[in-house]
């Protein structure tokens, strides 16, 4: 393994560029990094798409960047990671009115998509997905990423539509997976931002256990902002499953913008005990709901690396923090944390800035997968490319049309513009921003071990 690691890191040094961080704190001052960057290809796993857009004639590019875990260093010097997709290609819909009520929702251009685990391999000058493991329910049937039924635990209240505005229905087992780790028995653990849920599967992706609000996890977690549930996952030295809630909870619909903390959740899979800790988000967001965590990975001794990102002072930031829970106090299962009602002895997680990815050439919005190599010096980060797609609207009378400009009346089956006038529009797919289209993996080799 040592020879394999040395070979890989020599390759990284040869391909990378050295950048220096600004003196933000002790870690940031003392660390520089050598950076290697790869486009992740998945030629054998393109998603079938029957739309007419020529950009997707060969299918939709998959996105396996919603979570990352180190897998192995191989004798030939190659390195492998486990990674995971989210719920699949999707995009925002116009305001959707049915029976006089407005609903949020998403377009699902590939509604039969199954959230899947991937194996990402870096070998010589390339990175590629070499295998996949689709997720399956307890009856061994493939699940989907479609929304959960209204009223069920984990429902976001959304409708799932195709581009003809047909309702695609729901999936009680639907998952929007966002993090991955593996236990000592070879079982995978995944997290999801619908529920939020923690999911245990066997090595073939079959679901064995599922935890959610009032289903083994505190009910307060149901008050996550819709689609902002668990965003990252790791396993600590004691075998506890550690998940992070993407953004501050919205308790009673009142706290998402004002609560300066989000939650770290620790589940003991043997005793089922759950502990929660407060993670202090940065202070320079327009409001705290703009803070988004990306992933977490354990570095031992109740210490972790964690991605925090979002616009601060008007500029997009993608930051890696070193987080210490050793002295952190647990928080209650009610909403007191979000309302600022903390006990006198309250101690949140300690955080220290390790890397500002933007200072190392990272120009992508979503850093969502994080892993550390056995050398404790090389950090891997992958992006969520949103499957390389975005929703487009063609309107002969509006050259800058976007879905937010329109309302769809499902009872009358008509589109209306902002002036409440009936319009004839066409909705379909286009490629998203050039810097976002590809799945990418960066290796940051620090100049000192963690």
Regions flagged by a language model, labelled:
Residues 27-450:
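Sequence/structural signature of beta-propeller domains
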